């Protein structure tokens, strides 16, 4: 979720974080359908570090450049195969689907924040799986079974 704290507007889409060199390097390149926001956390707040390229991008995106206090220093509608440098130094870059800047009514000077939803794994954790193991057969073989509920008198 992206929040324009200055204007009280909220975009409820998914947000992912790019906080390592490889995540920042990959970015949204070759992503066929950008349907989430990607927040880049940069090592320093400079114009050079915050410059982006749109090589190998399959579609246009909205880009919000923020300083270390999360205030907007520049906004761009970025098109494929272009290079962009923000007007001021940026510590954070938010790449979003086209239209999010308009939806948030974002302008230079606005404070933008975000919340990242915890990604859930489709694979159960080992602890959950162990709770389901029980001895079911009289011959001692182990099989998957729901644990027997304890009665009050036990």
Curated annotation (Swiss-Prot):
Gene3D superfamilies: Protein of unknown function DUF192. It holds the Pfam family DUF192. It comes from the Archaea. NCBIfam families: PRK03760.1 (NF002996). Belongs to the UPF0127 family. This is UPF0127 protein TSIB_1463.
